[in-house]
């Protein structure tokens, strides 16, 4: 079985060189996914010297494996936010999601990026009657915030469902093709280096020094870390993901079953 994202299967891309010298810049962006390239896109006319690096090819990380959905409807999230915080916070989150959708679709249309952008509807469904009350609470939030919706008894697909909530103004697109479009648009305006892994980031007096796995250095006034996971340990932060270098359990038993030694 071929294990490859449907977004990148059969898609050709322009390869960028890897970093092979020490350089300086005003802004360094680490990570060439949708966060990194979107950041660079919005800075492209700033007049700053901008460098973007990615440990592999741009867009081959988390972005290439996402759902390809642009929707403010993410399960029954607004009911959850409202329950844990308040309606104002839930509304702020809703507006942020709508703004993100508008930003991406506007860029696609303005730059004429071919990424299969299609307007569609979004759905949340359940067959668990115990969860129906949560649908009612989500609908109440929709009503208060003028969100168009429809309650259905089945999905458009041939999939069993009893409670279906449908909303409008969502999109689907190929995120990898979108990033390819951004990269081609930006490659002549900024410096993009692929297969360039950042392994160390040090704060100096008035600049940052990023060291790569090939022992090259990037001196920058500002650094944007747009990688899926941070590649460095931040003081007072707990690492969410670390590499397991070695793990084993050994045991020796004596005649006394209570005497067990673990290593």
PLM region spans:
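Extreme N-terminal leader/targeting segments of oxidoreductases
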Residues: 1-27
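N-terminal Rossmann-like FAD-binding beta1-loop-alpha1 element of flavoenzymes
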Residues: 23-52
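Redox-cofactor binding/interface segments in oxidoreductases and associated redox assembly factors
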Residues: 30, 72, 225-226
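Glycine-rich FAD pyrophosphate-binding loop
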Residues: 45-65
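Dinucleotide-binding Rossmann-like beta1-alpha1 core, especially the glycine-rich loop
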Residues: 73-152
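Helix-loop-beta segment of a Rossmann-like dinucleotide-binding subdomain
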Residues: 87, 114-124, 153-181
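Helical element adjacent to the flavin cofactor pocket in flavoenzyme catalytic cores
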Residues: 141-143, 164-221
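Flavin-dependent oxidoreductases
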Residues: 200-263
């Amino acid at each position: 079985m071929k294990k490859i994202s449907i977004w990148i299967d059969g898609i050709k891309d322009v390869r960028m060189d890897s970093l092979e010298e020490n350089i300086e810049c005003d802004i360094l962006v680490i990570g060439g996914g949708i966060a990194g390239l979107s950041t660079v896109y919005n800075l492209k006319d700033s007049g700053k010297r901008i460098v973007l690096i990615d440990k592999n090819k741009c867009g081959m990380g988390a972005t290439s494996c996402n759902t390809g959905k642009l929707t403010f409807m993410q399960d029954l999230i607004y009911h959850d936010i409202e329950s844990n915080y308040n309606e104002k916070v839930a509304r702020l989150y809703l507006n942020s999601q709508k703004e993100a959708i508008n930003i991406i679709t506007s860029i696609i249309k303005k730059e004429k990026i071919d990424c299969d952008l299609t307007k569609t509807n979004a759905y949340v469904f359940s067959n668990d009657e115990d969860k129906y009350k949560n649908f009612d609470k989500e609908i109440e939030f929709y009503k208060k915030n003028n969100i168009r919706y429809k309650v259905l008894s089945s999905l458009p697909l041939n999939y069993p469902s009893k409670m279906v909530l449908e909303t409008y103004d969502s999109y689907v697109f190929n995120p990898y093709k979108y990033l390819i479009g951004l990269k081609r648009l930006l490659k002549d305006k900024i410096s993009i280096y692929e297969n360039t892994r950042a392994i160390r980031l040090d704060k100096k007096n008035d600049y940052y020094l990023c060291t790569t796995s090939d022992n090259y250095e990037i001196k920058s006034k500002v650094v944007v870390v747009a990688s899926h996971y941070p590649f460095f340990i931040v003081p007072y932060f707990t690492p969410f993901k670390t590499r397991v270098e070695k793990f084993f359990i050994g045991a020796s038993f004596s005649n006394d079953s209570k005497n067990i030694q673990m290593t």
